[in-house]
């Protein structure tokens, strides 16, 4: 890995925030409402929105879109293969379940939901969610390409945080994946030379100081 970029070398200002306090409140919909009613300016909603497709729209109507975001833990979607005998009667070919690498959303217990992350985020944005906190472990170029596709589509509406990785290559997230907003555990926030450089660079976009 190259040496951390100096602030002057950063082509795009990047927001850096602590992950603590950005995760969804406990207690399901009641906990979300209690947090908003207590004055939280912004709440990220996770599995509750995945299980209830109407929840985001309902909360946006009651509290305003600027206060509702998405929490989206993801992992690379597994590919299964099946025999295609319909498209050409003379040939039998194996076809994959997904045509290109993509992320699927994980449930709160870490199991796979089978829900295509990019599709779901787009649907929730359409219903009024303002941004998304994506937790992912970027393991290879395929993950970087997925990230780049998402950031090209939604830009600084996306916060990116590590899922399980304790020492992620944040420089690649920014330079190759296009990440414009990073949310990291406190230890990484305090000790990463690269993040120190990012925090000293000019920042664009909305502040996250009051995100609940």
Q: PLM features: what roles do these ranges have?
A:
Residues 34-43, 62-68, 126-131, 150-157, ...:
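Glycine-enriched alpha-helix->loop->beta-strand junction motifs that scaffold or abut catalytic
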Residues 19-23, 109-114, 134-136:
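Phosphate-binding glycine-rich loops and adjacent basic patches that engage nucleotide phosphates
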Residues 28-35, 113-123, 168-171:
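Short, acidic/polar
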Residues 1-8, 31-32, 38-55, 133-141, ...:
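Glycine-rich phosphate-binding active-site loops on the catalytic face of alpha/beta enzymes
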Residues 38-130, 202-212:
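Conserved anion-binding
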Residues 116-152:
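Extended amphipathic secondary-structure runs
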Residues 6-26, 55-74, 140-169, 202-212:
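Alpha-helix-loop-beta-strand connector modules within alpha/beta enzyme cores
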Residues 58-59, 83-86, 147-149, 173-176, ...:
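Short, glycine/charged-enriched secondary-structure capping and boundary segments
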């Amino acid at each position: 890995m190259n040496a951390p970029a100096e602030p002057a070398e950063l082509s795009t200002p990047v927001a850096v925030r602590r992950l603590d306090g950005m995760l969804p409140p406990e207690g399901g919909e009641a906990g979300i409402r209690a947090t908003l009613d207590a004055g939280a300016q912004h709440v990220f909603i996770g599995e509750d929105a995945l299980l209830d497709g109407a929840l985001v729209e309902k909360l946006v109507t009651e509290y305003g879109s600027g206060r509702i975001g998405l929490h989206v833990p993801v992992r690379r979607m597994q590919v299964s293969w099946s025999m295609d005998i319909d498209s050409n009667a003379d040939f039998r070919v194996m076809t994959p379940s997904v045509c290109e690498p993509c992320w699927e959303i994980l449930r709160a217990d870490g199991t796979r939901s089978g829900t295509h992350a990019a599709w779901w985020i787009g649907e929730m944005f359409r219903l009024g969610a303002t941004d998304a906190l994506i937790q992912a472990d970027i393991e290879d170029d395929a993950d970087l390409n997925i990230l780049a596709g998402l950031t090209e589509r939604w830009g600084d509406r996306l916060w990116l945080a590590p899922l399980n990785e304790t020492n992620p290559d944040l420089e690649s997230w920014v330079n190759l994946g296009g990440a414009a907003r990073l949310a990291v555990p406190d230890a990484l926030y305090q000790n990463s030379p690269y993040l120190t450089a990012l925090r000293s660079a000019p920042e664009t976009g909305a502040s996250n100081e009051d995100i609940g």
